[in-house]
């Protein structure tokens, strides 16, 4: 009897392995949902949409963008963490992914344990822009204006804990200005209200604002990266404008639920790598102020872990609190 049970168990295991192998070879056989934890029109959404066509070509299945904004990206990220780990649910997010755990200690997901890295797709600076009515053309003039009117100027970000929020609080910390943070639920609404003059300043990813800078609806003051952006060589960095040790870089990347089959993860990683090498994709990203990243999934994993430690230090030093 035991022999028959053992034989049945072994047969079941072998059949399971064969089925898994066949499933891996068949993957993907239906559309893939790309969960973007921010509303349409923001930088994350823009970069995701640039990648959808080449990803569809590489995978042979449609890529369906599903915008799930709210709570500084935490709503959509939680949805992705709890989605079926079958290779058909992928989170496409930005570097707030490594900021939020240090700002919101009771999140319903764990960014290290609940996700596996697929691709760091693009690197991008935040850009500081102002409404054209603001009488400041550079960082020094903006600092002088803010100091002359303490508490009167406000700055928008895509949400509490976003890279733009971190950049704004660092700006306050390092320059001594008193400006008021106005968090939005995504880049689209934040940009719209800055263009409309409801807020005077905005720290946001370049894809969300750059076309409006070029059209004259917003004025670029500086970028937050260590060096000038290739897409905007005439826009100075905040550091070179006289604010020392000021660097806030952002990334956009894809992650899958942690238990996604290894074969599906590998296929997704290869598809994203192929898409990011596409000359048209690289050109489209550059036009938005972003640069396609050439980073392996293991390097992406290391970046996530390093940033968790970095932002923990910055958040404590700047005394940033949820709003």
Give the positions of each predicted feature:
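N-terminal signal peptide c-region/cleavage motif recognized by signal peptidases
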Residues: 19-23
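N-terminal (or domain-start) structured segment
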Residues: 24-113, 152-154, 176-203, 294-295, ...
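An extracytoplasmic/periplasmic, membrane-proximal ligand-sensing/linker region
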Residues: 29-31, 174, 214, 237-240, ...
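Bacterial N-terminal signal peptides
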Residues: 8-18
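Hinge/capping helix and adjacent helix->loop/strand transition within the periplasmic-binding protein
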Residues: 82-88, 102-189, 238, 251-284
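A ligand-binding cleft/hinge motif common to bilobed small-molecule-binding domains
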Residues: 97-106, 170-174, 201-235
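N-terminal secretory signal peptides that target proteins for export/translocation
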Residues: 1-5
């Amino acid at each position: 009897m035991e022999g028959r049970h053992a034989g049945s168990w072994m047969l079941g295991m072998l059949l399971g392995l064969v089925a898994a192998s066949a499933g891996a070879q068949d993957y993907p056989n239906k559309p893939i949902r790309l969960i973007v934890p921010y509303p349409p029109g923001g930088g994350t959404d823009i970069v995701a949409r640039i990648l959808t066509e080449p990803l569809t070509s590489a995978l042979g299945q449609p890529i369906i963008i599903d915008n799930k904004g709210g709570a500084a990206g935490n709503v959509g990220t939680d949805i992705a963490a709890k989605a079926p780990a079958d290779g058909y649910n992928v989170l496409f997010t930005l570097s707030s992914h490594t900021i939020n755990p240090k700002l919101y200690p009771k999140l319903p997901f764990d960014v290290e344990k609940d996700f596996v890295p697929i691709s760091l797709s693009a690197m991008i600076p935040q850009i500081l822009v102002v409404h054209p009515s603001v009488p400041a053309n550079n960082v020094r003039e903006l600092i002088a204006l803010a100091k002359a009117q303490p508490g009167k100027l406000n700055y928008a970000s895509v949400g509490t804990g976003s890279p733009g929020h971190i950049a704004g609080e660092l700006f306050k910390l390092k320059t001594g200005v008193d400006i008021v943070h106005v968090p939005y639920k995504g880049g689209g609404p934040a940009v719209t209200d800055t263009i409309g003059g409801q807020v005077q300043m905005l720290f946001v990813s370049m894809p969300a604002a750059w076309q409006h800078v070029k059209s004259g609806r917003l004025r670029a003051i500086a970028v937050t990266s260590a060096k000038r952006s290739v897409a905007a060589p005439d826009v100075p960095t905040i550091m070179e404008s006289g604010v020392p040790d000021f660097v806030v870089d952002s990334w956009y990347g894809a992650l899958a639920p942690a238990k996604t089959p290894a074969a599906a993860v590998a296929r997704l990683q290869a598809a994203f790598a192929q898409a990011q090498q596409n000359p048209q994709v690289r050109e489209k990203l550059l036009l938005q102020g972003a640069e396609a990243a050439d980073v392996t999934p293991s390097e992406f994993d290391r970046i996530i872990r390093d940033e968790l430690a970095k932002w923990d230090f910055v958040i404590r030093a700047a005394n940033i609190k949820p709003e």
